[in-house]
């Protein structure tokens, strides 16, 4: 009997569970601004992504910022093409010197901001846009997330399906050669 178990143990290789692998679900580029700054923000995001931009309208009145209900207060675009996301991330991280603060990584996602778009390789200054910055949010997922959002026989996902902060760090260090730094400032 021991001979059979030894033979089986030698020939079986440990295979990682494919359902535990993490992947990028989407990347959201967001730029805020009212009135004329909104038009410049739309031009900027179109120039970076080349896709259709969605305008964000405010629901509350904030007089200090000149915002009233129904007024355009920003724009965003959601990208789901993995190759395009990886290409853009590599270009964005060059502006950040290939390092990211640990504080910007949370469960299932990480976020960071680009202060000036002219720092991104391949983008030149556009006089119509001026100097603008934008925010980037990248969301991760595991296989099986569809169960939570499908129409028929919808189910819930346990907490262990969430992508942890440590797993995101490993992904960024291995796939994008990114250095995670522990900054105490911004």
How should each PLM-predicted stretch be described?
Residues 4-186:
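Ribosome-associated RNA-binding proteins
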